Amino acid sequence: YSGLLYRYCSKLIISEKPKNKITFLRKKFRNISYKMIVKHKLHSEKISNHVAILAKNKKVRKIVNELQMRMIKKNNRVCVEGRDIASKILVKDPKYDLAFYFKCSLKIAAHRRWLDLKKLVPLREVTKSLKARTYLDKKRKNSPLIKVKDAILIRSDKLSKKQVLAKMSNSIDKVLKN
């Protein structure tokens, strides 16, 4: 979910070219909903290249994190996805009940992204972009991509979407029974 928010920020900045990005994003994020965000096509290569740079900005991260917390606190139980949800957003009040960390080889991940992009971008470019983004996410100063200690590791290289969901579902069932 946080990835979508950063992608939405990138789309807005690319399309509207504001002079002051932070003021612009604060205003845009005041009254926004998940439904408003998912209406947009946010998985273009142009947005993907822009989002990794934008996500390093501490002020942008603060705006996105505040929106996430508002949305999370509105709900009693919620499923949230993002590269720093367990490590930065839901570390306390509310704290996550369960965290997953997904690992996949660059080759498989790039191929899957390439298919998502309907093969409109050369696979070589998708691979290069994904490698750079993952590197930037892991090395950024603010909220780097890390696996939290108690996260359940799911290696998705050799798993179908159905198999990944089954693993997650089993883990969720165990937590809900306790």
Question: Residues of each region from the PLM?
Answer:
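ATP-dependent small-molecule kinase phosphotransfer cores
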Residues: 4-78, 84, 89, 107-111, ...
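Phosphate-binding loop of NTP-binding sites
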Residues: 91-96
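Phosphate-binding beta-loop-alpha motif at adenosine-nucleotide cofactor sites
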Residues: 97, 147-163
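Conserved AAA+ ATPase "SRH/arginine-finger" region at the nucleotide-binding site
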Residues: 102-105, 155
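Conserved AAA+ ATPase "sensor/coupling" helix adjacent to the nucleotide-binding pocket
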Residues: 112-117
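C-terminal alpha-helix
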Residues: 167-178
